[in-house]
Amino acid sequence: MIAVRVDHSQDADSRWYTGSGIYRDVYLVYANPVHINLWGVSYETKVKRNSAVLTVKTEIDNNADKNLDVEVFNRVFDREGKIVNQGKQTFRVMADKVSGCEMQLDIQSPKLWSIDNPYLYTIVTEVKRNGKIVDKSETRAGIRKLTFDADKGFALNDQPMKIKGVCIHHDAGCLGAAVPKEVWQRRLKSLKGIGCNAIRMSHNPQAT
């Protein structure tokens, strides 16, 4: 048994309501000595006229005492679960270090993420060693084009857009810091209804 305890008695006051205690999920992660680093899959997008390039970056943590060769597989699924592209790369991860690789995948006729249609793809990353999967990760990905111009301002997917935002602390008032998802659903619906399209999350991490 593993017990996690939080003691906030030494610093129980603040300029804002902290919520104290554990208000986010707690996970115990058991991983293979060769595994995807925590938050180790990221991506960048480059939108063209009728296509987009999705650059997937993967960090592999090798806790073994020797260099090892691994295979990294990336598959991109659309919202309906159809594979739109995939790729494989073999590289060597150094002993007791984090090594990274990049893979570029072309997406034809991509559905772009926008405020009114937040379309998301899913990147499934698998790491194999000697033909066996040693780790797997799923990452939601939105393909969009962001541009900033000193004269024209901000544009999303080449469409001018005014950023109309609010600042929200991590708590939900009398409901505490462990905010139920239903509260966020109501908040976001209300904010969008008054024209809000951006949120600054402060100051602490939000509850999951």
Placement of each model-derived feature along the sequence:
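Secreted/periplasmic carbohydrate-active enzymes, especially glycoside hydrolases
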Residues: 1-208
